[in-house]
C-alpha cells in the first residue's frame, strides 16, 4: 500500500475576444495510490488561485457532473478533485490474486466499507484495511481550510430523487428537513449537512434535503462523514445529461457562498 505524486502544469488565464471575461485553464495534479496491486488515480484540477471553491466527484461514470464543475470553474476559479476510474462507478482492485469492488462514496466509515464490499461479493478484512487507507488518502487531498465542500453527482431516472427522502422513501430516516418544489424536476436537488445552506436554497425555491447529521445511517458516504464532524457539505444532485441545469445550480451555490 502506498502512493506517489506527479504534478503536470497545464495552467493559464485567457480573455474572451468579445469581452473582458476571464477564462481559467487548470493546473492538473495526479495523485497515485496503490490499492492492492492496482494503481488508483486521484486528479486535482486547480483553476487560477481561488481556493475558496472546492468541488469533489467520486463516481467516474457521472460525466455530466464533472463537465458542469469544469464549466463553472473556468469562470470562477477554484479546485476540482475527482477519482479517475475509466468512467466506471465502482472501483475494482486486485489483492492477493482476488478482485474486489467497492462504491467510492461508501468508504468513509468502516461499516460503510464492509457493507459495500459484501454487496459486491468481495469482502475480506485485509481489503477493508486497504480501503480505509485509500479513504484517508482522499480526505487528505481536500484542503483543510475548505469552508464548504461541494460534491457533484448525477442520478438516473427513477434511481434517486427528492422523493427518496420523503416519508416511506428509502432514505427518510436520514433527513432532518425537506423542501420540495413541485415546479422543479424531482431528480434535481441539493443535499446538505448545513442548515444555513438549507434555508438559503429553500428560500430560492430549490429542492433541498437537510441531513440528520447525528442520526443518519453511517453508510460510509462523504455526507455522513462531514455531518458527523459538523462540517459544511453540499451535494449538487442532477439527472444525467442536464449539463446546463447542473451548471446553473452550482453557480447558485457560489453566488450565495458569502451567506453560508
Q: Predicted regions span which residues?
A:
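Structured catalytic-domain cores with a bias toward divalent-metal coordination
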Residues: 17-260
Amino acid at each position: 500500500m502506498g502512493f506517489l505524486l506527479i504534478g503536470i502544469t497545464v495552467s493559464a488565464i485567457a480573455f474572451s475576444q468579445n469581452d473582458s471575461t476571464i477564462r481559467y485553464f487548470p493546473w492538473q495534479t495526479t495523485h497515485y495510490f496503490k490499492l492492492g496491486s492496482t494503481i488508483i488515480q486521484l486528479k486535482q484540477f486547480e483553476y487560477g488561485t481561488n481556493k475558496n471553491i472546492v468541488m469533489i466527484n467520486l463516481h467516474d461514470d457521472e460525466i455530466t457532473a464533472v463537465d458542469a464543475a469544469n464549466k463553472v470553474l473556468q469562470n470562477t476559479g477554484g479546485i476540482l478533485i475527482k477519482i479517475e476510474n475509466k468512467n466506471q462507478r465502482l472501483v475494482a482492485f486486485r489483492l492477493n490474486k482476488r478482485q474486489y469492488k467497492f462504491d467510492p462514496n461508501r468508504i468513509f466509515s468502516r461499516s460503510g466499507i464492509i457493507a459495500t464490499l459484501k454487496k459486491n461479493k468481495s469482502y475480506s478484512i485485509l481489503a477493508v484495511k486497504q480501503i480505509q487507507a485509500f479513504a484517508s488518502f482522499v480526505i487528505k487531498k481536500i484542503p483543510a481550510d475548505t469552508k464548504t465542500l461541494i460534491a457533484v453527482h448525477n442520478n438516473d431516472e427513477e434511481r434517486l430523487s427528492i422523493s427518496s427522502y420523503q416519508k416511506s422513501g428509502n432514505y427518510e430516516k436520514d433527513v432532518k428537513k425537506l423542501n420540495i418544489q413541485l415546479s422543479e424536476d424531482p431528480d434535481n436537488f441539493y443535499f446538505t449537512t448545513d442548515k444555513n445552506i438549507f434555508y438559503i436554497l429553500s428560500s430560492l425555491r430549490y429542492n433541498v434535503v437537510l441531513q440528520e447529521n447525528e442520526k443518519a445511517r453511517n453508510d460510509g458516504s462523504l455526507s455522513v462523514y462531514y455531518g458527523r464532524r459538523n462540517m459544511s457539505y453540499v451535494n449538487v444532485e442532477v439527472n444525467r445529461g442536464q449539463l446546463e441545469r447542473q451548471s446553473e445550480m452550482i453557480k447558485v451555490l457560489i453566488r450565495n457562498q458569502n451567506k453560508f
